[in-house]
Amino acid sequence: MGFDAIVVGARCAGSPLAMLLARGGCKVLLVDKAAFPSDCISSHYIHNSGTTRLQRWGLLDRVRKSGAPAMSRVRYDFGDFVLEGAPPPADGVQEALAPRRAILDQILIEEAVASGASFRESFVVEKLIWEDGRVVGIRGHDRDGVVVEERARTVVGADGAGSLIAQLVDARKYDEHPGTTCFYYSYWSGLPLNVCELYIRPRSVTVAFPTNDGLTLIGQIWPLAELEPVRANLEGAFHQAFDALPAFADRVLAAKREERFFGMIARPNFFRKPSGSGWALAGDAGYHRDPITAQGMRDAFRDADLLAEALLDGSPAALDLFERRRNQDSAATYEMTIQRASFAPPPPEAMALLAALQGNQEQIDRWAGIDAGSVSAAEFYSAENVARIMNDAAGAAVG
């Protein structure tokens, strides 16, 4: 066969996977239908449990130097109270980053090529080549329309939630939940930030954080039921949300929107069976969730790491282990994401716990670490830790 692996999709799951396989001695072909550098719809945010992988791969300094500001703190504004914390480090890395995808993906592609992978952009995969029930290659065409066939021991779909590869192999979906939000964002100048800010309200979430070129991304998330009025007047819908946040609104009024609005609507939640005879899936192709918790790139990096390890091992047992490890790592965040995306009111005891965190910086930092992936939700919400938080709050009130 021509290649050990063909990776279809060259963004934040596919390029790191191709890089790691090439570093492991594999002959790898990486293809993507897009031309690069190019942007794509994205939540942008990489939690520190994702940036730690960039460090491990030797890429964190390059992403830093691209102009994406580091963030070590997150500010959660619930209206009645505010919690601001610094998530604990993940393997020594505390910072989160939110690079523009045209910049990040180009860095990842360049490193894959430098590691030995072959890369073809503007290459459209049309079908898979099968032999005796096993995937053995791809058929597609390049930018000039020339039809090309390439063969490999394994074909990996890293081509997003609507993965063509997943469709062609009929990868089984499970634990599915429909999309329940609409998320729109754009970029503003004149709004300097050095933290990620979230404003959580009953029927909307506003998020703002710095990205490349001195710009700040502002995103608005609404329940899907609000889609039609929101889509009919995006500018008005954003400013209506800002009006409910007076201090933030004043800062936005002094800033300037520099680009059009981008949107993600009713993004589905699902797991897919991530491997079979001659094929595998990585990133959003194998596991997808609502963008409200901004876990996509962190999960894509994780999949690249775990799947590369499994493919380099080469055994069916290693691929089965990849699925189990992916699912175990995703389980708590998946449930948390679905709950937040439902916009269902939190139970009173949950809000009481958050309110009790006020003034307890150590526990605020640990709570912020749940989203960041550096603190276990099970440990934070254990009966022992909850009792400690409530007792500390009661003691502070008496004092």
Predicted features, each with a name:
Residues 66, 229-311, 316-321:
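FAD/FMN-dependent oxidoreductases across multiple families
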Residues 309-399:
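C-terminal helical "tail/cap" subdomain of flavin- and related membrane-associated enzymes
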Residues 35-55:
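Conserved N-terminal glycine-rich FAD pyrophosphate-binding loop of Rossmann-like flavoproteins
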Residues 8, 22-42:
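Glycine-rich FAD pyrophosphate-binding loop
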Residues 111-248:
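Predominantly flavin-linked oxidoreductase catalytic cores and closely associated redox partners
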Residues 55-106:
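A conserved beta-strand/loop capping segment in the N-terminal third of enzymes
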Residues 1-13:
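Beta1/beta-strand and adjacent pyrophosphate-binding region of the FAD-binding site
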